[in-house]
């Protein structure tokens, strides 16, 4: 009796994936996730909002600040870690 239940679960999973794909641009399921990550990549959390540690994120070509030294709130230029 496990086989019919497994088939039903697989079919329901396929339907939900197809349903979600239809709602995104170009059928890319990761599109909303990429936007969410990009938002936090471009606007990093300020030092007061995090614990005291060294934090880096991806540097953009047009940005001078590539990371925060959380303890002092200093902006670290690209290439210096």
UniProtKB/Swiss-Prot annotation:
Its main location: secreted. This is U12-hexatoxin-Mg1a. GO terms for molecular function: sodium channel inhibitor activity; toxin activity. Blocks voltage-gated sodium channels (Nav). Intracranial injection into mice causes lacrimation, slow breathing and death. Intrathorax injection into crickets causes death. Disulfide bonds join 52-66, 59-71, 65-75. It comes from Macrothele gigas. The modification Proline amide is found at residue 78. It is found in: Secreted. Belongs to the neurotoxin 15 family. 01 (magi-5) subfamily.
